[in-house]
């Protein structure tokens, strides 16, 4: 409010102040650790031997209702991209809470350090895998942020990791949601770079010689999931450089 342009960083800092998230100082108006973000500490790459022992993600055997829906989708949308044979996402509140706690306990401590890192054949790494549960209202963003902050105060996760994760939720997720409610439906039709190329057909198959794109697309088709850095810096960035018409990416 009152600014000439929309920027996530302004929104993020205001939300931190308003809700008292990772704030300190006598008046509670200073960022914990003396800085608003820890991007410099959160850009490490894996060594030559790879990510090592990454904790297994929480998986859930599809129940009867989920199996029924899977069968329906396979019958009615058989020609659509993607597969359902490895579906193991949380579909209940209880399962979502298990996924959240597993992330906090096992992957949050290293999330920040490696949040921008990728490795071939490793779709899960130290990410939370909670986006679907949040979007389906199985988890509340406020409670997710609170649990992560509590882990920091308990000494179970370092500040750079917790701040990096909080920024993904309270920053990016809520910022984009805010843009949706303030600028849609017109925002969906914007094309500031006047881009008009078609999205390559192999985006729907993963059949490309470009390794990073192939890996990101293949896991998206297999699991319905790609982490934020794959979407931003691999599939999204390539489409941007190619000049793809925006609606072909998000339609």
Regions from the language model: what does each represent?
Residues 96-101, 105-226, 241:
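Gly/Thr-rich phosphate-binding loop signature of adenosyl cofactor/nucleotide-binding cores
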Residues 1-89:
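Beta-rich, aromatic/charged-enriched effector core domains that present basic-aromatic interfaces
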